[in-house]
Amino acid sequence: MGLAGVKKKQQIGVDPRNSKWAKDTNRLGFKLLSSYGWVNGNGLGEKQHGRIHNIKVSLKDDTLGIGAKATNDLEWSGLGEFNAIFGRLNGDESAYGVYAEKAKVQQLTYERQSANEKGLKSLELSRRFVLGGTFTSEFSEWMQKAEEDEDRVCEDASSSDEAKREKRKKHSSKKKSKKKTSTGSALDPKKLEKITKKKKKEHKKKDKESSSKKRKSGSSDKEEKKKKKIKLKDKPESTSSVEKVKEGNRPASIHFHTRRKFLAQKRAAVSDPVALREILGIKG
């Protein structure tokens, strides 16, 4: 038992997409284009931006009429395009469909611009292809701002330091100029000579005092050295030689004593079989 409905048989032809004609290289158009340097698979035009694929036939698989499927949300009749054409011819921009057409044209121009920016030839590739960009996080922006702030602070500090140095230089130059003017104007040449003579006398006195102190210290050092030499000569040589001998023999005698003790203990352990067994860990 089959379904209660009219049976429809569909007979598809041998070559529904007309590929036999498309692949035929003996056609006049194919020969003419190949004589100009065209190769199968290339597009037409200076930049070869023309269509590469052949035009295909689409089969209508339904019995619906024109305007049965909605092209827009508001238009069902399928006559909106004609209204737009008439509106453009009459110069009426408020006609139905004119705004939609303008929007389509603007969209196409925008897509072409984006394709040119991306360096792509076809609009289809520009719709699918998305250019990648560098990821800039908030942290990198914050770091840039911090570096800029540090540079500003350093510049301000350097400018303030330079200003302080300039002030100090000016102040010191003013002081020097004041001193020069005061010494040149207030003091007479006679007074200056007296001052210089006094200073020379003071220097001479100081030099004499220092030289006398050095002589006294040198004589006292010589006397102390002589006394030490006399004391060393008075001491007997015998006591010094005995002490040297004692100091030299002490470590050697201690070393030999410990060595003898160790050898005696070793001999006692080897001679006693019980002690040997205990050392080697042998039972029985």
From Swiss-Prot:
| Residue ranges that the Swiss-Prot or TrEMBL entry lists as coiled coil | none
Q: Where in the cell is it found?
A: Nucleus, Nucleolus
Query: Which Cys pairs are S-S linked?
Result: none
Gene Ontology CC annotation, any one: nucleolus
G-patch domain ranges (all copies): 25-71
Q: In the record, which positions carry Phosphoserine?
A: 159-160
Q: Which domain of life is it from?
A: Eukaryota
Q: Which UniProt keywords apply?
A: Nucleus, Phosphoprotein, Ribosome biogenesis, rRNA processing
Family named by the database record? Belongs to the PINX1 family.
Known role: Involved in rRNA-processing at A0, A1 and A2 sites and negatively regulates telomerase.
Protein name, UniProt field: Protein pxr1
At the highest ranks, the source species' classification is: Eukaryota, Fungi, Dikarya, Ascomycota, Taphrinomycotina
